Amino acid sequence: MAKTNNKTNNEIYAVRYARHDGRTAANNFIGGDPHEASGALEFYVWAIRTGRGVVLVDTGFDEAMAARRSRSVLRPIAEGLRSIGIACNDVSDVIVSHLHYDHAGNYDVFPGARYHLQDCEMEFATGRCMCDAAKRVAFEADDVTAMVRKVFADRVTFHDGDGAIAPGITVHRIGGHSKGLQSVRVETERGPVVLASDASHLYAHLEPVSYTHLTLPTNREV
């Protein structure tokens, strides 16, 4: 794993953009009871201000996708970024933790950004595993094909495991929730922060229970 002990002036902002009310245990756990209430789930993207620009972690989904999947957009991501003084054109790099619909939508909102993705996530999202309805349910064909178009436009950098994005910002493949799920480690003045994405949604996912939210083996412990 790439490591650094150097503190940086990186600043991390959590931008909440959507919400899903009325979730059940079946929404949060494989094998969960569809009659058991499980509360709401909030959706975020993460903006990292660096000394050289802005790195965005994930791009969320838009209002059309929210309506299709019965979610509620609280405010568009572009509006949320503007509230902290960031314009879409300020984003130099986008780290896509994985290609699920709630992490890889809004694919036309950041026209000048370079995207960062794990090799095996693109392989997973375009290969034979998508013939399985259970594995593809969280993917949207438009999001995946948009990423393919970015590859052909020379706007994607692929990583195989650990990789460096900017000073003090690295990615690390975890797997589990999706084959190429990657977390982001950010060095800040207060110390390192790990944006673990969907390695775990809830504290309950860290407990030894009989059901989980993982569909594939994990690459490492979180």
Model-derived regions, located:
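Conserved small/polar residues in nucleotide/adenosyl-binding loops
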Residues: T212-T218
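Active-site metal-binding loops of divalent metal-dependent hydrolases
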Residues: T59-D62, L99, C120-E121, G176-S178, ...
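Zn-dependent metallo-beta-lactamase
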Residues: M1-L56, F61-E63
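Core dinuclear metal-dependent hydrolase active-site scaffold
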Residues: A14, W46-R49, V55, F158-E189
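Metallo-beta-lactamase
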Residues: K3, R75, G80-I86, D90, ...
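Residue-level marker for buried hydrophobic side chains located in beta-strands
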Residues: V55-V57, I95, V193-L195
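Active-site metal-binding motif and surrounding structural segment of the metallo-beta-lactamase
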Residues: S72-L117
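Divalent metal-coordination and catalytic microenvironments
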Residues: I48, D58, V91, H98, ...
